[in-house]
Amino acid sequence: MALELIGFVPILLLLGLATIQLGIAAYAVSQAGTAARAAARTESYAESDTDGEGAGRAAMSDWMADRADITVGRGPGEAKATARVEIPSIVPGVGNFGTAERSAVMPRDEESTP
């Protein structure tokens, strides 16, 4: 009985690590969406004290904001923001789990449209 348990422990540890890594990846996607919405919303205001990129970073947790790349742009009647977040790895020696990317588009204020 004890021998079977010892053989099964590494499998349980790998499943636990995979589950935690999947949770971190889902959190990165959520943070990218939050940053994109906040950045687009800020860029859509006619008079704003902050820029969209700063608002996007402020909406994220600090350790994810350090890994983020946020771009904002304005079009006719709309503001668009895209946030890309590098997915961190908890597995030693494995450094790249890709990036999470989310975009958001918000209508601009009437006063700010050309």
Predicted regions and their residues:
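Alpha-helical assembly-interface signal, strongest on the long, hydrophobic N-terminal helix that forms
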Residues: 1-55
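Short, conserved structural patches
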Residues: 45, 49-114
